[in-house]
């Protein structure tokens, strides 16, 4: 989740600025280079308290946009840029952020759950299952606030009045309309599938949480289970090889361009955002 803060700084703030200046940040993996660079420099920075303040102020600004929260974030950005322990490379990457303030109204039009991982992981999972089975599965959610807040948007992507179209870059190619059947909220205690998913999620969280106590041996046992040997759908820092490969990939159809081009065919409340 900490990496995702930096990915969202790039996606929400920097990408918006570049978009208004006619530059596609996703071409050539420029977004990944910046997000991974910011994250790497941040975890190596010696002033942990200042870095934590920077991260927390960004999350606070996105969750509850206000004059005060915006000022706090950009003020902390400058504090971190000019901190005595900030390396030159980190300074240069952080310097992409201050100019974004002139586009802040456009950047912060998202719902408060925008930076939550539930929806992007769900979307990628749906695409992966459809790629394997060619079946548009019905999905049940428990009482998930991010899902409840975004169900209208996801249904609108599912019901797009366009032919099935492949968009995206390299291994990240996916299709629209969103290949999913019915999506409903259910009570977890009444659905065995949801209970089973919770067990797997808890086990995976336990296995991946760093620790050095007596429970490490149980982590190793859980990690060795066959079901956890093929986890492809994660949001995490990229390897150098992945970024280098991604830099060479091109998209015949850019996902955002496609959605914007067909926005009139997405039946969604005008107050919602693509």
For each predicted feature, which ranges?
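Phosphate-ester processing/binding pockets and catalytic centers
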Residues: 1-274
């Amino acid at each position: 989740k900490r990496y995702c803060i930096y990915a969202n700084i790039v996606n929400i703030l920097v990408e918006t600025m570049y978009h208004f200046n006619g530059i596609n940040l996703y071409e050539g993996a420029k977004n990944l280079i910046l997000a991974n660079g910011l994250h790497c420099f941040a975890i190596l920075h010696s002033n942990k308290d200042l870095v934590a303040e920077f991260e927390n102020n960004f999350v606070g600004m996105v969750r509850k946009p206000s004059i005060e929260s915006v000022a706090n974030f950009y003020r902390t950005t400058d504090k971190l840029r000019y901190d005595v322990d900030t390396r030159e490379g980190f300074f240069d990457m952080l310097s992409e952020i201050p100019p974004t303030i002139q586009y802040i109204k456009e950047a912060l039009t998202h719902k408060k759950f925008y930076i939550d991982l539930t929806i992007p992981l769900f979307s990628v999972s749906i695409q992966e299952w459809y790629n394997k089975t060619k079946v548009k599965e019905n999905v049940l959610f428990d009482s998930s606030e991010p899902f409840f807040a975004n169900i209208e948007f996801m249904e609108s992507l599912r019901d797009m009045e366009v032919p099935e179209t492949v968009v995206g870059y390299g291994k990240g190619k996916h299709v629209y309309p969103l290949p999913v059947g019915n999506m409903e909220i259910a009570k977890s205690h009444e659905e065995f599938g949801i209970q089973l998913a919770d067990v797997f999620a808890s086990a995976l969280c336990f296995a991946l949480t760093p620790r050095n106590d007596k429970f490490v041996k149980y982590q190793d046992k859980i990690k060795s289970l066959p079901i956890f040997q093929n986890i492809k759908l994660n949001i995490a820092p990229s390897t150098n090889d992945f970024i280098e490969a991604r830099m060479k990939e091109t998209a015949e159809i850019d996902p955002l361009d496609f959605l914007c081009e067909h926005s009139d065919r997405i039946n969604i409340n005008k107050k919602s955002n693509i």
